[in-house]
């Protein structure tokens, strides 16, 4: 009888083409998502060597990073470098026969929101993209991770990838979340616990009652930030919620093919007794709403907490790093998180730009007004999310409260388009990274859940969403 296997083991084994004595493996890739930033050199490499895209039907190209999210974006992109990248993707997709969603296509959006929406993302698949947040798709029980530009070219040409197998890590979140504590708080708490290097060399499987209780969109938020915990990929075993989400999606199997697929997907569970190289356990009931205070996703604390004192850290290198973070963030040890005032609020990104996120925001801000000191924007993660939000009247709630309602794209998650922070501006953001300069030169980013960001926009400072009325 074969040894018990983890979910990661099963997907890996199903896609293993070849393994060398040194552990180097050739892995078959089921789905390849492409965007404008990491693909131009890859397509040029194909062109120079006279190669074709091996499986264009398994490849999907979407513009997201550089596209403007302002209402006048149909007028074009002002920044020349950004415009060239977007134009190159359109040209390359047409030349190589790859399906392409332009900025004028309502299916366009952030690639990691578009894939699941279209049924392009399915359980048990290997999925890659030249983007580190490809881990998002692991919410479906797919082995998904980012790749570099040379690897993008390799996958386009061969539909395979050279890899070495990672270790298995389990993060189990037991119990149920308290009211107003979300998937975003779970993943920030996990990263705070294990650190940004805690998952290095591993693929993380997320399990436990709290994870199972999450919607598919909540699970995507969890897997999205796996990379911030140091692991290339995160996985959640598929279940009935997964199957229901997939049914009816444009590219999903239909009829008998769907039933056959579901029968296979049900086997994608870790076997009893399977070995994990590392196990981390958290108690969901004890988790508060969380805010980041520094310039790393591991710099997190309860909204009711205070900015920590780096002098309490014994390791000199880490202590110096945290003092630098506080200096960059313009904060002093002992400051209450709820005393920190804000200049900007950004709600969106591949972490929290889905319809459920926007519904939570609407609940918080309906009938209220954004603080006069705050510039707040909401950016739907795709054209379909925008369409759904407007069908539900959410846009009217946002506009009445004083939020800027934008077109879909990556927006202020990263300073690669017109949406960015000015030096010294402080932002509550539902995105995934708070590195120095991530949202703009000398911009200061605090990572929070959508509801926390919404409440902060109204109050002008961080507030405990559990006490919000």
UniProtKB/Swiss-Prot annotation:
* Catalytic reaction list: (2R,3S)-3-isopropylmalate = (2S)-2-isopropylmalate
Q: Which domain of life is it from?
A: Bacteria
Q: Which GO terms describe its molecular function?
A: 3-isopropylmalate dehydratase activity; 4 iron, 4 sulfur cluster binding; metal ion binding
The positions annotated for binding [4Fe-4S] cluster are 350, 410, 413
Which Enzyme Commission number(s) are listed? Answer: 4.2.1.33
Give the transmembrane ranges. Answer: none
State the UniProt keywords alphabetically: 4Fe-4S, Amino-acid biosynthesis, Branched-chain amino acid biosynthesis, Iron, Iron-sulfur, Leucine biosynthesis, Lyase, Metal-binding
Q: Name one GO biological process term.
A: L-leucine biosynthetic process
- Pathway per the UniProt entry: Amino-acid biosynthesis; L-leucine biosynthesis; L-leucine from 3-methyl-2-oxobutanoate: step 2/4
* Amino-acid biosynthesis found in the keyword field: yes
Q: How is the cofactor bound?
A: Binds 1 [4Fe-4S] cluster per subunit.
Q: Does the keyword Glycosyltransferase apply?
A: no
User: What are its cofactors?
Assistant: [4Fe-4S] cluster
Under InterPro entries, the record lists: 3-IsopropMal_deHydase_lsu (IPR004430), Acnase/IPM_dHydase_lsu_aba_1/3 (IPR015931), Acoase/IPM_deHydtase_lsu_aba (IPR001030), Aconitase_4Fe-4S_BS (IPR018136), Aconitase_4Fe-4S_dom (IPR036008), IPM_dehydratase_rel_enz (IPR050067), IPMI_cat (IPR033941)
Q: How does it assemble?
A: Heterodimer of LeuC and LeuD.
NCBIfam families from the UniProt entry: leuC, PRK05478.1, PRK12466.1
Checking HAMAP family in the record gives: LeuC_type1 (MF_01026)
Assigned protein family: Belongs to the aconitase/IPM isomerase family. LeuC type 1 subfamily.
Q: So what does this one do? A: Catalyzes the isomerization between 2-isopropylmalate and 3-isopropylmalate, via the formation of 2-isopropylmaleate.
Put simply, this protein is called 3-isopropylmalate dehydratase large subunit
Q: From what organism does this protein derive?
A: Rhizobium leguminosarum bv. trifolii (strain WSM2304)
